Swiss-Prot record:
Cofactor note: Binds 2 [4Fe-4S] clusters per monomer.
Residues involved in [4Fe-4S] cluster 2 binding: 212, 228, 255, 258
Organism: Pseudomonas aeruginosa (strain ATCC 15692 / DSM 22644 / CIP 104116 / JCM 14847 / LMG 12228 / 1C / PRS 101 / PAO1)
Function, in words: Catalyzes the conversion of epoxyqueuosine (oQ) to queuosine (Q), which is a hypermodified base found in the wobble positions of tRNA(Asp), tRNA(Asn), tRNA(His) and tRNA(Tyr).
Primary gene name: queG
Protein name as catalogued: Epoxyqueuosine reductase
Length: 361
């Protein structure tokens, strides 16, 4: 269903009962947790502004766009009174995270990206939830978001009681860790709000800050995206800085290190969503094998996958860095040499860097 523009609507009968029903319906649709937030995000707006002014967003210009709308839901979607925040876990049953990271000839893909793209799946579930609400109360104004618009989803999740923003800047949940996606439904109904998570439970722990391969955390709760492997391998379009390439290791799409070491993730549970299970053995693939994919193979095997966001050229760029950090084996060297004449200058430069790492000129 196409989202309707928000409109004035009478208060629904028995808001508390409706709020509980919304949470029940959300769980029936596969969400593990549902909370309701108001539209005041308080200090989060100032925190975002300081982060932007420091330049920590790198080339993610969209983070600075839209002005105050990002931190003010009622300005982004006029008429919004509440935000329904929902959590869906994504961790596969057999993660192989430590195993793959410890095997330098393997390609490490962030575990959220191993299955189908979460955007479409969660957006569809949000639409279904809106339809269920509409069947109960009649027409109402709503708009669904899944990491695809200027929404401070982590701040909203904290306000809705889904967890707290940890030192690694991710939302943490005492019963579920941090391996989950977030979705939001902006609504024009004055539903009762849930208690905000106004305390954090990281304590003295600094495991996430200490483990970061590229020292991307400038302090607790402060991430410099320009040094973050997830940013460099997914969002960044240029040549990866030379000084960071050896630190990236075999991480070719995203990074999970600050989640892997988080003590709260011992409570993370495997997802029940089949769509989030690994496809094409990407949880245990060889760097050299992936590097030899043609563009047609890349497009075919990443159809409906988050990996499409990088595109073929940056996919090869990332793999070249991984191969440069891999052992000097015959398959590694042959794969790199096969790409020496690749049309993209970006790819060629990373290939030559990788070959020099192996003593090849």
């Amino acid at each position: 269903m196409t989202p309707q523009p928000l409109a004035d609507n009478l208060s629904p009968p028995d808001p508390a009962r409706l709020a509980q029903s919304i949470k029940d319906w959300g769980r029936e649709l596969g969400f593990q947790q549902v909370g309701i937030s108001d539209v005041e995000l308080g200090e989060h707006e100032a925190h975002l502004q300081r982060w932007l002014e420091a330049g920590y967003h790198g080339e993610m210009d969209y983070m600075a766009a839209h002005g105050s709308k990002r931190s003010r839901p009622a300005e982004l979607v006029p008429g919004t009174l509440r935000v329904i925040s929902l959590r869906m876990d994504y961790l596969p049953g057999d993660t192989r995270m430590a195993q793959v990271l410890a095997t330098p000839e393997k390609a490490y893909v962030s575990r959220y990206a191993l299955g189908r793209d979460y955007h479409k799946l969660i957006r569809k579930r949000l639409q279904q939830l809106a339809e269920r609400i509409q069947a109960e109360v009649g027409p109402f104004g709503f708009r669904a978001f899944v990491d695809s618009a200027p929404v401070l989803e982590k701040a909203i999740a904290e306000q809705a009681g889904l967890g707290w923003i940890g030192k690694n800047t991710l939302v943490l949940n005492r019963k579920a860790g941090s391996y989950f996606f977030l979705g939001e439904l902006f609504v024009d109904m004055p539903l009762p709000v849930d208690p905000a998570m106004d305390s954090e439970h990281c304590g003295r722990c600094s495991a996430c800050l200490d483990i970061c391969p590229t020292a991307a955390f400038v302090g607790p709760y402060r991430l410099d995206a320009r040094r973050c492997i997830s940013y460099l391998t997914i969002e960044y379009k240029g040549a990866i800085p030379l000084e960071l390439r050896p630190l990236i290791g075999n991480r070719v799409f995203g990074c999970d290190d600050c989640q892997i070491v988080c003590p709260w993730n011992r409570f993370a549970r495997p997802t029940g969503q089949g769509d989030f299970q690994p496809r094409h053995s990407l949880d245990n693939a060889e760097l050299a094998e992936l590097f030899l994919w043609s563009e047609e193979e890349f497009l075919g095997r990443t159809e409906g996958s988050p990996l499409r966001r990088a595109g073929y050229e940056r996919w090869l760029r990332n793999l070249a860095v991984g191969l440069g950090n891999a052992p000097s084996t015959i398959p590694v060297l042959e794969a790199l040499k096969a790409r020496r004449g690749f049309p993209s200058e970006l790819v060629r430069e990373h290939v030559e860097w990788a070959l020099r790492r192996h003593g090849e000129t």
